[in-house]
């Protein structure tokens, strides 16, 4: 779409043209200095919606196995971080929490994300907690128009959180539909694309 940059600016409040050095170079450091949060702010935002601070468990059998092959006094303690304890059951809730916070802070009525998996459920979960409307634009169908079961299931999770799910086939129409939906609704763009 010819209006891509205009739509992106409207849907995020960021003019990416300010950060372009050349057709192949982008000033990410300048962008982060202008728009980023410090770590204390991130933790505060995530605590508000039950994200992060997930439990850490020792896998004792694995630790024992590693140590049985290691020299005496050596061998790691094997730990696993349980990110399923996040509000949406996914580590992607960490990124989604910041997007939903930013959308609410800037006064957007809703949030949109193009995704085929866990990020959609995370965005829908965080949007619900921030009282924002949510649309998930999802690649569901293969080239034979068969819905991929794991992606269909993620769409159901999004709907359970109150999101509207637009189901598409895999291909370039995903980005077109994202831009069109952003333009039509005026919602915040939480996509990772």
What are these regions (language model features)?
Residues 1-193:
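PLP-dependent amino-acid enzyme catalytic core
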């Amino acid at each position: 779409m010819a209006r891509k940059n205009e739509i992106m600016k409207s849907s995020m409040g960021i003019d990416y043209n300010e950060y372009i050095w050349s057709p192949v170079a982008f000033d990410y450091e300048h962008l982060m200095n202008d728009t980023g949060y410090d770590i204390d702010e991130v933790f505060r935002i995530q605590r508000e919606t039950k994200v992060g601070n997930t439990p850490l468990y020792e896998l004792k059998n694995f630790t024992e196995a590693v140590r049985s092959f290691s020299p005496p006094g050596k061998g790691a303690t094997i730990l696993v971080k349980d990110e399923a304890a996040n509000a949406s059951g996914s580590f992607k809730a960490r990124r989604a929490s910041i997007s939903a916070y930013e959308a609410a802070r800037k006064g957007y009525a809703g949030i949109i994300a193009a995704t085929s998996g866990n990020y959609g459920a995370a965005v829908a979960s965080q949007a619900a907690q921030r009282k924002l409307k949510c649309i998930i634009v999802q690649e569901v169908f293969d080239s034979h128009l068969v819905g991929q079961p794991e992606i269909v299931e993620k769409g159901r999770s999004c709907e359970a959180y109150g999101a509207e799910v637009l189901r598409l086939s895999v291909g370039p129409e995903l980005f077109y539909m994202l831009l069109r939906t952003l333009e039509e609704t005026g919602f915040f763009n939480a996509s990772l694309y």
